[in-house]
């Protein structure tokens, strides 16, 4: 009974505690044990590991190579040191700079540059240092372009002497343009058969005079000097003169002026057309004097067949000297015999 009363008193005092009867070691004795209330369990979340960066390099695929180029450790250390010395952003920029510096030696050793075959398909960006992946063009390319530009004006024989051109037809140092005779040097090239070729410049005789080739080219394609006077007295279109200047200078080279005259209307062209004074022009020595005058009256004085084809063009500043020139021209056209009126 006492134990039961004690149980009731304990229940009244401790309302929240749970009483669990337990049998002691001795029979007949009962002990009460209190258990703590249930505690909420906290879940500990493990810290997530950061995502792994891909080890694949960002690169542009090139034929025959992978992502990396294997090199000795000493060479890699030198490239790394040079990158710091030149203050480049990457080692690849330093290697690109080294290739550009060694381009002349590479061309001398291999005959070609370091431009890959698939250069057109690569997406190459210009770096901040201004370096590019382009190799300098070979000397034969520049010589070929210069020859094409000079051949239009007929001066190719002055740029390249025939004795300096190699006689080996199979050599690749000069392009095909130099190994074959130019069209301007042989006027009979069009009359030949398609299978036949003109003689090569290297096969010419050593004692050939280069002046003959120059004179033949000048006689074949004479330079033309353009004169466009605009007389204020005329209301219609003025004449545009093309004066041929040949190398011989004789009267046989003078052609009909009507063949080199074109008419144009100055009203369609805004601005003022000033006349040009050709003071002294010596064809043989390529000497030319130019002067600009304010007046539009032009007088033409042509010298004789001597003096190497000298042609003088003068400007008249007044109207009266021009009439005198026209009087001289009419006298030349209508010669008088001595003693006749």
Swiss-Prot record:
<dbReference type="InterPro" id="IPR017887">
    <property type="entry name" value="TF_TCP_subgr"/>
</dbReference>
<keyword id="KW-0539">Nucleus</keyword>
<feature type="domain" description="TCP">
    <location>
        <begin position="55"/>
        <end position="109"/>
    </location>
</feature>
<dbReference type="GO" id="GO:0042802">
    <property type="term" value="F:identical protein binding"/>
</dbReference>
<dbReference type="GO" id="GO:0006355">
    <property type="term" value="P:regulation of DNA-templated transcription"/>
</dbReference>
<feature type="compositionally biased region" description="Polar residues">
    <location>
        <begin position="332"/>
        <end position="341"/>
    </location>
</feature>
<feature type="compositionally biased region" description="Low complexity">
    <location>
        <begin position="1"/>
        <end position="12"/>
    </location>
</feature>
<feature type="compositionally biased region" description="Low complexity">
    <location>
        <begin position="33"/>
        <end position="49"/>
    </location>
</feature>
<keyword id="KW-0805">Transcription regulation</keyword>
<keyword id="KW-0804">Transcription</keyword>
<feature type="region of interest" description="Disordered">
    <location>
        <begin position="1"/>
        <end position="59"/>
    </location>
</feature>
<feature type="compositionally biased region" description="Basic residues">
    <location>
        <begin position="50"/>
        <end position="59"/>
    </location>
</feature>
<protein>
    <recommendedName>
        <fullName>Transcription factor TCP23</fullName>
    </recommendedName>
</protein>
<feature type="region of interest" description="Disordered">
    <location>
        <begin position="183"/>
        <end position="218"/>
    </location>
</feature>
<comment type="subunit">
    <text>Interacts with SPL.</text>
</comment>
<dbReference type="GO" id="GO:0000976">
    <property type="term" value="F:transcription cis-regulatory region binding"/>
</dbReference>
<keyword id="KW-0238">DNA-binding</keyword>
<dbReference type="InterPro" id="IPR005333">
    <property type="entry name" value="Transcription_factor_TCP"/>
</dbReference>
<dbReference type="Pfam" id="PF03634">
    <property type="entry name" value="TCP"/>
</dbReference>
<dbReference type="GO" id="GO:0048510">
    <property type="term" value="P:regulation of timing of transition from vegetative to reproductive phase"/>
</dbReference>
<feature type="region of interest" description="Disordered">
    <location>
        <begin position="313"/>
        <end position="341"/>
    </location>
</feature>
<dbReference type="GO" id="GO:0003700">
    <property type="term" value="F:DNA-binding transcription factor activity"/>
</dbReference>
<dbReference type="GO" id="GO:0005634">
    <property type="term" value="C:nucleus"/>
</dbReference>
């Amino acid at each position: 009974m006492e134990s039961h009363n004690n149980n009731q008193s304990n229940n009244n005092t401790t309302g929240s505690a749970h009483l669990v009867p337990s049998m002691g070691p001795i029979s007949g004795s009962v002990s009460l044990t209190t258990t703590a209330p249930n505690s909420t369990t906290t879940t500990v979340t493990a810290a997530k590991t950061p995502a792994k960066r891909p080890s694949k390099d960002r690169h542009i695929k090139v034929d025959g190579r992978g992502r990396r180029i294997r090199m000795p450790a000493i060479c890699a250390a030198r490239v790394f040191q040079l990158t710091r010395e030149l203050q480049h952003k990457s080692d690849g920029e330093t290697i690109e700079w080294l290739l550009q510096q060694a381009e002349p030696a590479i061309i001398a050793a291999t005959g070609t540059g370091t431009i890959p075959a698939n250069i057109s398909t690569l997406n190459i960006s210009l770096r901040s240092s201004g370096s590019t992946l382009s190799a300098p063009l070979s000397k034969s390319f520049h010589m070929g372009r210069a020859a094409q530009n000079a051949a239009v004006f007929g001066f190719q024989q002055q740029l390249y002497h025939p004795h300096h051109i190699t006689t080996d037809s199979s050599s690749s140092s000069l392009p095909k343009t130099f190994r074959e005779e130019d069209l301007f040097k042989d006027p009979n090239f069009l009359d030949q058969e398609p299978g036949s070729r003109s003689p090569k410049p290297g096969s010419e005789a050593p004692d050939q005079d280069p002046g003959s080739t120059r004179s033949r080219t000048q006689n074949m394609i004479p330079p033309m000097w353009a004169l466009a006077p605009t007389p204020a007295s005329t209301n219609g279109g003025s004449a545009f003169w093309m004066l041929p200047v040949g190398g011989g200078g004789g009267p046989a080279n003078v052609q009909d002026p009507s063949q080199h005259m074109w008419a144009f209307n100055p009203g369609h062209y805004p601005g003022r057309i000033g006349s040009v004074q050709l003071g002294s022009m010596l064809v043989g020595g390529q000497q030319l004097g130019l002067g600009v005058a304010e007046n539009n009256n032009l007088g033409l004085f042509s010298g004789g067949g001597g003096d190497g084809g000298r042609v003088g063009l003068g400007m008249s500043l007044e109207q009266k000297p021009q009439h005198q020139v026209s009087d001289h021209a009419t006298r030349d056209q209508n010669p008088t015999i001595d003693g006749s009126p």
